[in-house]
Amino acid sequence: MYNFSRVRTIIDKEWAEVFKNRVVLFTIILLPLIFTLLPLGMLGFFGSNAAMQGGDSADVPATFAMTCGNLPMMDCVKIFMVNEFMLLYLMMPIMIPITIAAYGIVGEKTTHSLEPLLATPITTEELLFGKGLSAVIPAVIATWGCFLIFLLAVPLTGVSKEVMAYIASPTWILAIFLIGPLMAILAVNFAIFVSSRAADPRVAEQISAVLVMPVMLVLFGQLAGFIVLNVQLILITAVVLVLVDFAMIRLAAHLFRRETILTRWK
């Protein structure tokens, strides 16, 4: 069993250190806001531009257009566009934990601030749990919060009820509220793995950013018409992520053995 007072101590320690960094603050605050304002701005532009109200079927891959049914082409174009921008909300749970873990862990290596903590009765599991939560919690709060802001602001752009229904569909609800946290867990454990071997937080951050590639592949796959996100694909992805997360947690636990930290983190 975890001693949650110890876990809370670790979380407070991590936040006190990493939130002093401007790069971390930018990633947690400004980046999610930018990712939220971009799709809202595009929807507002489409809604206010009379010349674009008719829509163009050439803007939408045939495989995606088939999912629109009898919707007006302009609505289908908006749904397709929103579908692309919504993938930004799956980048946030990756980028935020990576930044927090990179600057937190590499900072501990350079300042040797972790060694005194290891002299306390805290267990390795509590240490990892606290470090993981300190990176995952801000990522999940930022992602969920910005998505809710997006949902509340979308009607102000003048979209139809059909477009609004798609945005609030089970596909994206599951993606944001299920896939998001799972990706955050993967990101923080991968960042722990990379940061434990890096001497510069920027290097650790850049290497860890490779996790963004699967999301980018989905984005380009949708643009090309090869992939159409649906509930089934989201659930399959969730199962795969659970397995990968478990493997990464085991790997992180192996890296954070006390003797490894004390002898190699010099």
Listing of model-derived features with the role each one plays in the protein:
Residues V18, P97-P116:
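Transmembrane helix boundary and interhelical loop/hinge segments in multi-pass membrane proteins
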Residues K20-G54, F85-I98, I141, L211-Q222, ...:
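Hydrophobic alpha-helical transmembrane segments of multi-pass membrane transport/permease proteins
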Residues M1-P32, W265:
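Aromatic- and glycine-rich beta-strand/loop motifs that create alpha-glucan
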Residues F19-F26, A102, V163-V212:
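A structural motif at transmembrane helix-loop-helix junctions in multipass membrane proteins
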Residues M92, P97, T124-A153:
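Selective transmembrane-helix segments that form parts of the transport pathway or gating/packing helices
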Residues P116-T124:
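Short helix-to-coil transition segments within interhelical loops
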Residues Y2, G104, R197, V244-K266:
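Junction motif at the cytosolic side of a transmembrane helix
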Residues A50-L71, C76, I149-F177, V228-N230:
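Membrane-interfacial helix-loop-helix connectors in multipass membrane proteins
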